[in-house]
Regions:
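Acidic, Ala/Val/Gly-enriched low-complexity intrinsically disordered segments
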Residues: 10-17
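N-terminal catalytic or cofactor-binding beta/alpha core of small enzyme domains
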Residues: 21-194, 199-312
């Protein structure tokens, strides 16, 4: 895992210097890409679906030739090692899980399609709606404009037609599958919880609370996305393991938490955020010596939640 090249599964080609400052055009061969990975979805054993949208490490090689930052810098936009952190929950305890393989810096599936900055494109349609919300204004909409270090990803305007392909080939594929899984679980058990799993930068946690440090954030749209009993159960399970838990700060939930919450259909959502500092070196993108323990603890909380939901 310390070998970055093999881990991200890309061939790094030379930068295309002719794109510097000009319109940037490239075409991705999506047939080369494995978009999703899923586990335990043929026979869903619990009314719980894990969504891991930001842990992907695969960059299309055409994209890498066209952008400014190197791979290490681009990877700082992802939720490092989050999929691997939860591995015991889906490989040993058989929790149904959907994970995106594609890197977040290429497309962010935890955003609405309209969270887009029209100024990024040289051919943005005049009649197309672009909801330039706070995240897209900061460069972190469905298509990231900047890295986590606020460095520009592109040296010039990009093609909106190319981005439409990203949405069709990756974004829609992820959400169509997640929708089917949540519907299947709800039909089988009478209800379903989508646990949207993320990691958060330690910097924002320390801004909000230096003492005690926020280890875990649970986002439930300020008590709107799931029954309080579920949030309280997860909070207590982490607290028993001596993790400090905050609710709805710094994050109350994003697109998946909001969009998949359908109380009338008894489909609920909860966003889980794990402070990266407690399991990894954020700057070097390496696991710390605490990784295995945190992985064990977080996965056990998820498994306990799965059994709790069976009797809910």
């Amino acid at each position: 895992m310390l070998c970055i090249i093999s881990y991200i599964k890309v061939i790094i080609a030379p930068k295309d210097e002719k794109n510097m400052g000009n319109n940037i055009d490239f075409t991705v061969d999506y047939k080369k890409l494995d978009i999703l990975e899923e586990y335990n979805t043929k026979d869903i054993k619990y009314p719980l679906i894990l969504s891991i949208p930001h842990s992907g490490t695969v960059f299309p090689e055409e994209f890498l030739r066209a952008v400014v930052p190197d791979v290490m810098t681009l990877r700082k936009n992802e939720d490092i090692f989050m999929k691997e952190l939860l591995e015991p929950a889906y490989k040993q305890d058989e929790i149904a899980t959907l994970s995106l393989n594609i890197a977040r810096a290429f497309i962010d599936v935890n955003r609405a399609k309209v969270e887009i900055d029209p100024s990024m494109f040289y051919n943005y349609p005049k009649d197309e709606l672009g909801l330039n919300q706070q995240r897209s204004r900061f460069g972190l909409g469905i298509i990231h404009k900047v890295t986590a270090d606020s460095e520009p990803i592109y040296a010039g305007p990009i093609s909106y037609k190319e981005v439409e392909q990203r949405i069709k080939k990756i974004y829609d594929v992820y959400h169509n599958r997640l929708k089917k899984l949540t519907t299947a679980a709800a039909e089988k058990f009478g209800f379903c919880l989508v646990l949207d799993c993320h990691s958060m930068p330690s910097k924002i946690c320390s801004i909000i609370s230096e003492n005690p440090r926020i280890d875990i954030c649970l986002g439930n749209l300020f008590e709107q996305s799931c029954p309080n009993k579920i949030s309280f159960f997860v909070e207590n399970e982490f607290s028993k393991r001596e993790y400090y838990v905050a609710k709805n700060r710094p994050y109350s939930g994003a697109f998946i938490t909001f969009n998949y919450c359908e109380p009338r259909k008894k489909i609920h959502t909860l966003q889980l955020e794990v402070n990266r500092e407690i399991y990894a070196d954020e700057k070097l993108l390496r696991k710390s010596d605490k990784f295995q323990q945190v992985s064990y603890d977080v996965s056990k909380v998820i498994t306990s939640l799965a059994h709790f939901l069976l009797d809910f």
